[in-house]
Design a protein with these regions (language model features):
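Bacterial N-terminal signal peptides
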Residues: 1-7
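A sequence-level/structural motif corresponding to short, flexible coil/turn segments enriched
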Residues: 10-202
Length: 202
């Protein structure tokens, strides 16, 4: 199953023009979860793949990244994963060109798994080389959903059925937000929720 990437621009009051489009993927199921523009005009795509997307599949769903120029030409693609399902759900490119990706893992993607699913966050350079990767969570189901990068680091938000900040999980899912510096060090994490289900997305 392939992923399509389409460039679009407005040619008038209502007409949408697609200067180019590309289709790419593995022979297995591929699902795109994020598209982000780089400072140089390139486009970065994050997806989950059950196939081989640049490297052999490590097991279940792997995380894959691809970079294209603003003319739709492939620059590189890469793939990383553990023995179980790993998915990217958030993608952001910092003003200085570093790529940050976050999501969830059901395995040991960047350390020992604490429970059902853990949050993970990773940083890559503009060439797709991994700089660092972090994993955190507790015994419940934890997911990272949205990532926002800035010059000095990155924010990640999501939801947790665990206790991430020494607070008490109120009921079901709580929302959380965390900030990491550019070297991957956790600066702070905050968890908030009500008696109902609460998600952090954005």
């Amino acid at each position: 199953m392939s992923v399509a990437l389409v460039a679009a621009s407005c040619a008038g009051d209502s007409e949408i023009v697609a200067p180019w489009e590309v289709q790419f993927g593995s022979p297995q199921a591929d699902t795109s979860f994020g598209v982000a523009a780089a400072p140089d005009g390139d486009v970065v795509v994050a997806l989950a793949t059950e196939g081989a997307f640049g490297q052999p599949n490590a097991g279940g769903r792997d995380v894959a990244l691809a970079r294209y120029t603003n003319e739709g030409l492939a620059v590189w693609q890469m793939q990383v994963g553990g023995e179980r399902n790993d998915s990217p759900l958030g993608l952001s490119v910092s003003p200085d060109g570093f790529i940050y990706v976050g999501g969830f893992t059901e395995g040991a993607f960047a350390g020992e798994n604490a429970g059902s699913a853990d949050v993970w966050l990773a940083k890559f350079d503009r060439d797709g080389t991994e700089i660092w990767r972090q994993q955190f969570g507790d015994k419940g189901w934890d997911r990272g959903f949205d990532v926002t990068a800035f010059d000095g680091g990155v924010y990640i938000t999501g939801y947790t059925a665990s206790i991430l900040d020494l607070a008490t999980n109120r009921e079901g899912f709580d929302g959380f937000a965390a900030r990491f510096d550019a070297d991957g060090n956790l600066e702070w994490i905050s968890q908030v929720g009500t008696d109902a289900a609460d998600w952090g997305q954005g």
